[in-house]
Amino acid sequence: MAAQSAPKVVLKSTTKMSLNERFTNMLKNKQPMPVNIWASMQQQQQLASARNRRLAQQMENRPSVQAALKLKQSLKQRLGKSNIQARLGRPIGALARGAIGGRSLPIIQRGLPRGGLRGGRATRTLLRGGMSLRGQNLLRGGRAVAPRMGLRRGGVRGRGGPGRGGLGRGAMGRGGIGGRGRGMIGRGRGGFGGRGRGRGRGRGALTRPVLTKEQLDNQLDAYMSKTKGHLDAELDAYMAQTDPETND
């Protein structure tokens, strides 16, 4: 009942024009055309680019800028190629790619394990200048010094001191330079840095095909382009697959 007795609301600013008529009038009265705006924008950009070109020409004509450009060219000529392969080919101190983990070790690299150019857990650390022994002493070694040489199962890891079996029971690594079979020193698994699970048959480096320089370059570039997390996961999977008995 209260709603019926409410006074009627009358809006003073009402209009009888329909929406169609209103929008039609708005379209007719539209002032600037989009083409004109676009043309004016292009003209402003051309003016600005002409100013920039003049400024760049003035900068090039300055003697200080010319001297800096000449210095930059001579520096590039002095350094030669600056791509990643040229930088990787240069030695990094004593751990150069020709000294320990380099391309000039065909005998050891012929015996690359299934990991390609991967070694133990400290591959990347050693090549970038670290030493990173994981835990134990040097002879026991942990999974340590294996600089991308194909030394199987971690390089300098062994199980004993320098008294048992040459340099200890594999003090130069299982399948490293002294394998448990007829390797060079003591008892390791494999020949000379080879894959060998043959326990004395010496399946290793000398039976592998020789890798060319291009193949080694491609493997190394692919390895260096991977991220650290990807390499760590891949290396952990490889170590768990090949060395299940030494999970410490």
Swiss-Prot record:
MF terms (GO), sorted A to Z: methyl-CpG binding; RNA binding
GO cellular component terms, semicolon-separated: nuclear speck; nucleolus; transcription export complex
Presence of the UniProt keyword Hydrolase in the record: no
N-acetylalanine: residues carrying this PTM: A2
Motif (GAR motif): 194-203
Domain of life: Eukaryota
PTM summary: Asymmetrically methylated by PRMT1. Symmetrically methylated by PRMT5.
Localization: Nucleus; Nucleus, Nucleolus; Nucleus, Nucleoplasm; Nucleus speckle
Glycyl lysine isopeptide (Lys-Gly) (interchain with G-Cter in SUMO2) crosslink, residue number(s): K70
Keyword annotations of the record: Acetylation, Isopeptide bond, Methylation, Nucleus, Phosphoprotein, RNA-binding, Transcription, Transcription regulation, Ubl conjugation
Chain positions found as Phosphoserine: S40, S49, S64
GO biological process: chromatin remodeling; in utero embryonic development; mRNA export from nucleus
Keyword RNA-binding set for record: yes
Region (Disordered): 151-204
Main location: nucleus
Annotated positions of the Phosphothreonine modification: T242
Region named Interaction with PRMT1: 153-206
Name of this protein: Chromatin target of PRMT1 protein
